[in-house]
Amino acid sequence: MTTKQLPSLTLVRRIKASPAKVFAALTKPELMIQWWGPDAGPTLSAEADVRPGGRFNIVFQLTNGDVHNPTGVYKDVIPEKKLVLTWEWREMPERESLVTFLLEPIDGGTELTLIHEQLPDEGTRQSHEAGWNGLLDKLVVFVGDAP
């Protein structure tokens, strides 16, 4: 019996900011609330207990007015290097997946790799890819050109 391979995605960005600054933007609620989300809509709230077993909870509003609430649990935390967390939508908790952020120092900044695994189907993978691309673009602008 073979197990079905669930869809995943991997995105990479080179950011003109230190791993410390990128990690802070991904983990500090007072920074997350300033930029988190896939489009120009606002982040309404951000909570993060950044330790293995700690939870995060983010509420953001899209420009079309839709409100989304991803939440999850931190599985692995290595400051300025790695962040692994479960990812679920408050409205669909049965669809838990796994997100990994890898931060690698490079000349001039940080290479950020985002891996989102265990997505339930191809449609979900495609929508998350679009969302993560928008979010990473916002992150690059938020932390870019800073030491």
Question: Where are each of the predicted segments found?
Answer:
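Hydrophobic pocket/interface hotspot
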Residues: 22, 32, 56, 74, ...
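Short beta-edge strand/loop motif at the mouth of beta-sheet-based domains
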Residues: 10-11, 30-67
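Hydrophobic ligand-binding cavity/cleft-lining segments
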Residues: 1-41
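Hydrophobic/aromatic beta-strand elements that line small-molecule binding cavities or substrate pockets
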Residues: 13, 46-48, 70-76, 87, ...
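Beta-strand/loop substructures that line and gate deep hydrophobic ligand-binding cavities in soluble
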Residues: 84-134
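A short, structured loop/turn motif at beta-sheet edges
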Residues: 19-20, 49-51, 75-81, 102-111
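Short, highly charged C-terminal tails/helix-capping segments
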Residues: 141-147
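Intrinsic-disorder/low-complexity, polar/charged segments enriched in Ser/Thr/Lys/Arg/Asp/Glu/Gln
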Residues: 6-12, 19, 43, 55, ...
